[in-house]
Amino acid sequence: MLRISLVFVVIAALFQSQAILAHSEHDKARFVAETGKDTGKCDQVLRPCKSIAYAVQQANKGDKILVSSGEYTINSSDELFYLKSALVPIYGGYNRFDHFQTQSPDTNTTELKNIPLDMAEPLRQQGFVIMADGKSLFAKDSAESKALQNKLASYYTLSEKQVGVDCVNGAAGSFACNNIDLLAHMPLNDFSSRPNSANDIWGHVDLNTGDEYALIGLRNGVAIVNVTNPEDPQEVGTIRGLNSTWRDIKVYQHFDESINAWQAYAYATIDGASDFVTIINLNQLPNSVSLVEKNTVVTKAHNVYISNVDHTLNITLPGLTPSLQLIGSNRFGGAFHSYSLATPSTLTGLANNYFGSGYTHDGASINITDNRKESQCDTRGDSCTVFIDFNEKEVKLWNITDTSATTLLGTGEYNDVAKSNQYVHSGWGTEDNQHIFLHDEFDEKDGGLNSTVRIFSIADLNNPTQVGQWTGPTRAIDHNGFVRGNRYYMSNYERGLTVLDITDPANPIDVGFFDTYTPSNNPGFNGAWGAYPFLPSGNILVSDIGSGLYILKDRTLESNQGKISFTASSISASQGETITVNVQRNNATAPDQAISVNYQLLPGSAKENSDYTPAAGTLNWPANDTTEKSFNISISTDTTSEELQEEFFVRLSQPSNSATLGKYSYLTVNIDGLVDSGSISFITAETTVAENQGTLDIALARQGSSAGAVSISYLLSSDTAIIGEDVESASGTINWADGDSAEKSLQVNIIDDSENEANESFFITLSPVAGSKLGVNTQFTVTISDDDSNTAPVVTLTENSEVNTGATVNVTATVSDNESDPMTYLWQQTAGTNITLTNATALAASFVAPSSAGDITLSFTATDSKGLSSSKSLTLTVVAAPVVLPPPPIENESSGSGSIGYFILFMIIVLSRKRLK
């Protein structure tokens, strides 16, 4: 009786689950059947769609497509390439009569026709039968076949590394383009973690060295790539994390006077999995990166943003205080909330740090310094920080100048597409803080529009008003965009990168693109996810979901009115002098308009007022004038003769009348002083090591300057661990040559005794040699974890169960450990027909069941850092699923209730055959 009751509950749940999922942006199933119709959203089991291509275009990121038994002919390249999507996976082997409940490819034969042979095996693994009868479109000698073959060949180049390909006659190799060159393409299979998809991207310039980096979100972590040589990108390291479709990344950099060096941290959020906020230490670049912590202020968040910073240098804007916003998190209903970066290696909540109602999907900020700060922000300071809240069905403007007294300023909406087809996704503000560009992620897919970017005037912060829009030539979805000068750089999904001229913000003009997704330009979730146009070099970073990292060169900046630029990337200044900074109007072929540009000084290691006099202003060129313009900066006098070399920055912005920003839009001003040789410190402050580990390597880094030779000495000292009894005595000197910034290491030998004892610690302390300087971590604590009292981890597996032949099977283990030691995992097959395990070194693995019935036995082993392990086995019985027949037809009206009864009885029988897990 209990079993039958449970079955009735399951049947009831079938009719409720889809309504529940309808409130979620992702993680829904879409259904396809031979007898379906290509209407609606394909998310109702009783109303499946007919074609795979249509269903994919209704899906959101993270959804999956379930295909019922039948024959499906692939007649377009669109469907062909959607079958390879990692973001919206497609599975065959389902049955519409059991409501797509169980995958059974051997029973529910799902045939695909017109599939190239090299795509056959992966699709078989997804539950499809491939009809290889020699009649594929790819075997025909027709124009259509040749076009498909060319598209397929172009698609395969997406998995190949490419460098230095100029855009000529609308193409850069296999990539369609206009005014954008390919400097380098780093495909997903070049990343060390071997991810199957990528997501968002951000950039970083290390102000200690000038090196440039890409930080790209991957399905399984965040990779940091050195792009200083843009034609030879090199991965520095990857910080691994849980698998997820969604990651977002931002960087904050600050100058640490105690070590006279710039310090930088990256903050990565995750959605779709509970992996907290990943804080990454970027201070060992270019040698390595490391995890600081998984900060638990939230379990997950869709996006992250840092306000009051310059997005090229990732440093604080003059006179402002940076704060970090977590967006779309599991707290506060998804409303954004702010955190202090006073201690950048962690997150500290700010008072009253969440507000309003609704879910913030993404955010940006602007700083108002004109009369609106008093008349509309009611702020009496130098500026008003306005947070732009992209809130699903509207954009909201908030005054976050004082995060403890945040107020709503205004709300903007639009009505050119039905509310049900809207999703206010993201956007950015113009450099003059007068307009916002807004992206809607659903208006193409659900509203039937071509790519559409809406422009809002915020001249009245209390009443944001749409004043224009850009409509693209394709239906590709516009995703994320950023303003640099009078260009708008936008990830445009299947169209790749799109660049708009926003000289007239209300009427943008398409001036360039680079198509990172070669098969199509449909409103699907393939192609370019993110873009970052702020590197000092001017190179553009693009992340593509299926093909990885692109480094691009912008050729949209050529203008008859010229390019405005500093004469070099840096200049030198002496203490106490007034320097002249020159700005050029270059390459002006028809300078018939007056132009202007703004300049602003940004503090670095040199501080405004104490080291230089702050300045900001506008430079003007009359029509037909191409002479250099200049402004002066006063450098303060060093009264102590003890100041080290310092620097600050000058940036150009807001070029007018179609002039553009040139190669050098940022200038570093280096003030002379004493030469610094950098500082030496341990990379981390502590570690725990197993007593039976043997030799322990401990890394040290030279941070800041690498000028001159430096040395440090080190010495071990006892705490609860005794030198000579628990660890061998050691001391020595470590040297760095002039120009050497490589990481060094020292070794200590742990003594493994046979006593049962508590954890014990000892210290390694650094000392300067001949005037060298120490950094932050001058003492390193080593905790020895006793292996004699160690207990093995405890492994729990799911119960033995039945699976259908040909089905995709997921197996999951849980592990606990009394000592909370780091773990490694391994799934292995010990009996049965051979299978291939995916993610065999993770807690959750998967495989495709064989086509023959029988038992499959798997073993899972968890091993702790001290070498103790535990294993458990799991037996899965592979069975041929029963054939599910359609319910009896309804003969007439009077027999309708009887048919429903038969149908319910039929569903009870089907579901009761399944083993409850």
Question: Across the structure, where does each feature detected by a protein language model lie?
Answer:
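Short boundary segments that mark the start of a structured unit
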Residues: 556-792, 883-885, 889-891
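A structural signal for beta-strand boundary/capping segments at domain termini and interdomain linkers
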Residues: 822, 867-873
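Right-handed parallel beta-helix/beta-solenoid
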Residues: 21-54, 71, 137-140
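A cross-kingdom C-terminal cell-surface attachment/processing module
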Residues: 900-917
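Solvent-exposed loop segments of extracellular immunoglobulin-like
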Residues: 820-826
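Surface-exposed, flexible coil segments in extracellular/virion-facing regions
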Residues: 828-847
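Feature marking well-ordered beta-strand scaffolds used for ligand recognition
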Residues: 102-567
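N-terminal extracellular ligand-recognition/capping segment immediately after the signal peptide
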Residues: 61-89, 93-98
